[in-house]
Amino acid sequence: MASRHNPKLRFGMTLREASSFQPSLAEGPPLPVVNYGLVGKQAPGLLATPSGELPKASAVVITWASAEWAALQHVFCAGRSPMPYSTRSSGTWAGWERYSAHLPSGAPSGWTFWGYYRTVEVGGERVLLFKSNTHLDWPGPTCLTALIKMIIADVNPSVILSIGTAGGAKPQDHIGTVRAVSAGTLFESGQPQSTWPEYKNGWKANDAILGSADFKQLLFPVPMTATDLQALSSEFNQHYRSHYTVGQLDPDGLNLGDPAPLIDDQTGGGASLLTTSTFVVGTTAGTYQNYTSIEMADAVIGQACAASNTAFAFVRNVSDPVQNAALPPTVQGNWGGAVYDACGFYTSYNGAVAAWAMLA
């Protein structure tokens, strides 16, 4: 049975709606070769990965969706050659093991494994990479919490990093912005924001590489052009039988990336992202601007880590910036989903590079 996880749930889409329209860039370039030597480092080393057990590691890096997994694979395992845009939806990669041991009783039918994993060496330390098949929306928060507790018990990491795409919350953030924090807040519908539970810790990333003069050369500006944006809006209007202009869908030009993507490391501080399993979209009016981004897992990870005093941080890339507050919510969600599909591969690359730099 196919996964019932819906990565577009935060856009207000059903799984069927999410699958019915998945646009892409007409001529999306490949991800570049990662020149680790520019910052005086070596490429991650590929280690033998045991099957059927999660090995000990000093750090765990978890990601969630196919395009995020492709970017993680590229940066941590295969950065010596370009990665084609067409591989962004690949469902598997050589060298990864599937983990299905100790599934909890009463788990939903069709959910048969926790995720995929492999080990690499970064900065002289063993790092466990994990592509999760266990999500907040499916099979649900209980299973997601169980996954994190199992990783903590079996791997005994010093820190767990969750990385991947997110919706923009800051009205100034262009597509491709990366914001890293060490706190997550759980959205609770119908409750005032002041009562939403927050889970935080004091882990602070090492910014020696992030702050180096040559680090920006490792980044890849999101290649969405004005022509691409016009084509995407036309395809969007055709699918949804609408007539919105680019100026209405993207009034502030946020879907055109910065020449050098912004990497904002706020780990160790008070900034928090927002976790949701329902429709939540940041807007140009500043809705949810007190948070760094909007995603679908991390506060639950923070809660599980905090219970065992395990350090954690979240490195999230803006795959879909804030939406035009003047548009109907359905249009906001649908447009955000279109941009996410077209560009999440590229935004995830920069997030993965930032996560690597924190560990290297």
Q: PLM features: residue spans?
A:
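Accessory terminal and edge-of-domain segments that mediate assembly/interaction
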Residues: 1-360
